[in-house]
Amino acid sequence: MKNLINQRLFWLIVAFACYSINLPAQLSDIKTENGLVSGYKSGEISIFKGIPFAAPPVGDLRWKAPQPLKNWTGVLKCDKFSASPMQRKPVPFMMWTEEFITPPEKLSEDCLYLNIWTPAKSAKDKLPVFVWIYGGGFSSGSAACAVYDGEEMSKKGIIFVSINYRVGVLGFMAHPELSRESGARVSGNYGLLDQVAALDWIKKNIEAFGGDPQKVTIAGQSAGSMSVCALVASPLAKGLFRGAIAQSGGILSSFMKSNLTEAEKSGLTFMEKLKSANITELRQKSAEELIAAGGNFGPVYDGYVIPVDVFAAFKNGQFNDVTMMAGWVDGDGSLMGEQKMTPEKYKQQAIDKYGDKAEEYLKLFPGNTNEQVTASLLELNLMQFAALPAHLWAGFSKNTAYIYQFSHVPVDKPGFPNYGAFHTSEVPFALHTLHLWKRPWREIDFAVEKTMNDFWVNFVKTGNPNGNDLQEWAKYDKSTGRIMEIGDHPKLSPGLHKGEFDFLEGTINNK
């Protein structure tokens, strides 16, 4: 009997030990401005998920700038992601929707939280900080998507932070009533104000996690990239970061063009659609009702968060001139969809738009056949959405600039056609998260991932992507147009797209 009891006790101890191994190891509590937080350990990395950085934007705080947090007592357990911002469930229209856009967590208006991965051993380590801003067309997205996991990147000696921000109607609707009740007399851009609030929280608190508040680099992709550019343009973000990485998206183009007056009109139309008499009634609607009503909302050139004339602001040096890295994916143009147009109509549009410059335009973007027209329109989309804004920003900057083009073609996803180097495909390569993306990866994919992530980490640490025996990446200047082409074998490509850049920039300057 005694032996039987001892055997059972032995196996209970073994079972408990195995169970304990699978539990996240606990950390010492971290003191933030608002109270203590606890996280967990994964190997040498300390992880904190779901740290609040602003008061929940619910009730009367809906459609208001983020408000300060209230202090809490005790220890706030931060070991799982918060709810994702309210949004429509994305239709899986492309091969990456599930991985990049569809939030894995529940949805809630109470979504202003951030996540931290840190390898620091103490608050004195003063490590550089990388802040990730997700994309999703300003209508969807979440910091909880697995492809934005920061553990691998933090193993290289940096602190990785991912942040949530409001999207869609709850993040960007402007309205005359909202403008009147705002101290700044503007409305909309709440999602961008969330980002500023998160950066302000990071500046005040990241030292407790072993970070250096003077060494913050912001980065984002698509709408996240446009957010990065908006923060560079915003006087509200001055001093909150020292470097910026913009992946596939900018605001120095015609893609974003809504001013406050136009945005307020859209808000009035939306209110009428929901048969609400005023903002008070609209605030009483459920978030689900608001989202079901549709609408297209995004950042606004309001003169407060973003300058009314961004191009003029950059041209006159009125922006946060930080060290920058910007680029695009070879297939970014397909984001706007394939446009059908006859060669005759295409050429006439070129004449109508460019006049005596039409001949030069048609040499750069030919349209003699249907196939040429389609290819040229895709190229023009790429230029306007991502490539030209990066080129212009680098030209206006007095700081160091690095430009890239991602052309590596990832392995196919079963059941989908091959999209080539498609919009968003570079993200897991840059963030070192291929292992979280379900594909039959090849050695070349992992080699490109290592190279690209090393470039990114080096830039976060020093403001320079070079080092680690990598292909030398020269600083960008408009005269030579040297661009790092990140393909199977990264190489510096002088003059890539230089003709297109020169022509399109000339048309802007002549307006």
What are these regions (language model features)?
Residues 252, 277, 281-444, 462:
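Substrate-gating cap/lid region and adjacent catalytic-acid/histidine neighborhood
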Residues 194-197, 201, 227, 262-269, ...:
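Extracytoplasmic/secreted proteins, especially bacterial periplasmic and envelope-associated proteins
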Residues 1-27:
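Bacterial Sec-dependent N-terminal signal peptides
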Residues 214-217, 276-285, 403-405, 467-474:
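Surface-exposed patches in mature extracellular/periplasmic domains of secreted proteins
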Residues 107, 388-511:
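Mobile gating loops/cap/lid regions near enzyme active sites that modulate substrate access
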Residues 34, 194, 212, 301-302, ...:
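Acidic/polar residues in short coil/turn loops that connect beta-strands
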Residues 96-279, 314-337:
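Serine-hydrolase-like catalytic core of hydrolytic proteins
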Residues 2, 26-189, 441-448, 452, ...:
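Non-catalytic accessory segments of hydrolases
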